[in-house]
């Protein structure tokens, strides 16, 4: 499984090896070149041997960043994650320009139960631009998505997987991870119960078909999912997301069925509320959102506040809207949607200076495209 092993081909993706400067035609240079060549040759098949050779080369030139990064890759292959992280960190301290090095460090940290730091380093690598091979990028993005799913950040997990839709991916791990997103199931992919795995697999297959622009196949797969597993948690929610673009009333019915079957399914409550806002029934939305607020994870309370603010705006309750949207802004200050609606609330209340300030903040954050700015529910078209 990705994240537990590091394919040999990926070493070539880690960096573009640039030999350090050493005086030409010296014993040290000749010895260094010999050690680095032998280490490179051993890297895929004999990582233990490669590590020792790289260490000898680094004794000659300790500031050789690429050597530290290759040691980190070899240690990762051997599942010596703490040592791998240390070696990668040394290499990146010397040469922080290697995007794939940051991504690999994130993969290594993810095996040390340091999810926050792992995600930070993976994102840094992504922002710099992962390059070299689709399989490497897939491994990185799938692992990041799995970490996010465990904390119920299904929106960000989907954002990690979305770029992979343009590649000819046939890896089952991609579909499994997509299945957990579609079902809004916050579990470790390795801990899926045997009886649940078929549900996750089929949900992932359907969601992946939809994401890769195969709507007919997705429709058939979602119908199969619903027919086979009508009482499994998340199934009606997943089908409701699929229906949003074509039949919003049917989607609403699916979300309501999900809540009936699974009263703790807060994503369905948020979906119901967002549809109710669109349908012009903010009072009903407020009721749904207060119910969701009681059970949603802490990192999703901001979304409850945001939609409560939107509902209050529609109900011409500017004071209530401002209170809710200010609460959302405190939790996610870099979210452009929050600043957009807060500007509207201030404008409705006649607070022009505050409205102008929030509009400017919205424009700034929108340009930066904060990853929290497009929740999964919104990305499926529930609210704009």
Q: Can you say where each PLM-predicted feature lies in the sequence?
A:
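Canonical tetratricopeptide repeat
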Residues: 70, 104, 139, 143, ...
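TPR/TPR-like (Sel1-like) alpha-helical repeat modules
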Residues: 110, 123-128, 142, 146-149, ...
């Amino acid at each position: 499984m990705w994240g537990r092993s590091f394919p040999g081909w990926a070493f070539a993706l880690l960096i573009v090896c640039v030999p350090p400067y050493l005086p030409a035609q010296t014993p040290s240079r000749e010895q260094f070149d010999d050690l680095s060549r032998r280490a490179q040759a051993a890297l895929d098949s004999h990582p233990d041997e490669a590590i020792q050779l790289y260490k000898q080369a680094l004794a000659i030139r300790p500031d050789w960043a690429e050597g530290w990064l290759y040691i980190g890759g070899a240690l990762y292959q051997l599942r010596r994650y703490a040592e791998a992280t240390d070696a990668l960190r040394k290499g990146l301290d010397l040469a922080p320009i290697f995007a794939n090095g940051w991504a690999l460090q994130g993969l290594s940290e993810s095996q040390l139960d340091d999810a926050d730091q792992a995600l930070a380093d993976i994102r840094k690598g992504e922002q710099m631009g992962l390059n070299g091979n689709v399989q490497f990028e897939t491994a990185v993005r799938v692992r990041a998505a799995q970490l996010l799913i465990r904390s119920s950040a299904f929106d960000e997990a989907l954002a990690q997987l979305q770029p992979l839709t343009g590649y000819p991916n046939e890896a089952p791990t991609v579909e499994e991870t997509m299945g957990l997103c579609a079902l809004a199931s916050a579990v470790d992919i390795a801990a899926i119960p045997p009886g649940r795995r078929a549900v996750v697999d089929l949900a992932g297959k359907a969601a992946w078909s939809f994401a890769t622009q195969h709507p007919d196949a997705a429709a058939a797969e979602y119908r199969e999912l619903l027919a086979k597993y009508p009482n499994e948690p998340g199934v009606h929610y997943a089908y409701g997301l699929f229906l949003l673009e074509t039949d919003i009333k049917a989607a609403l019915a699916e979300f309501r069925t999900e809540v009936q079957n699974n009263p703790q399914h807060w994503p369905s409550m948020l979906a119901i509320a967002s549809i109710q806002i669109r349908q012009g029934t903010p009072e009903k939305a407020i009721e749904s959102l207060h119910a969701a607020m009681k059970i949603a994870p802490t990192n999703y309370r901001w979304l409850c506040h945001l939609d409560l603010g939107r509902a209050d705006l529609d109900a011409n309750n500017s004071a209530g809207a401002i209170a809710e949207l200010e609460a959302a802004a405190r939790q996610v200050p870099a979210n452009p949607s929050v600043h957009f609606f807060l500007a509207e609330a201030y404008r409705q209340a006649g607070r022009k200076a505050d409205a102008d300030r929030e509009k400017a903040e919205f424009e700034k954050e929108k340009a930066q495209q904060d990853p929290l700015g497009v929740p999964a529910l919104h990305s499926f078209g529930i609210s704009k």
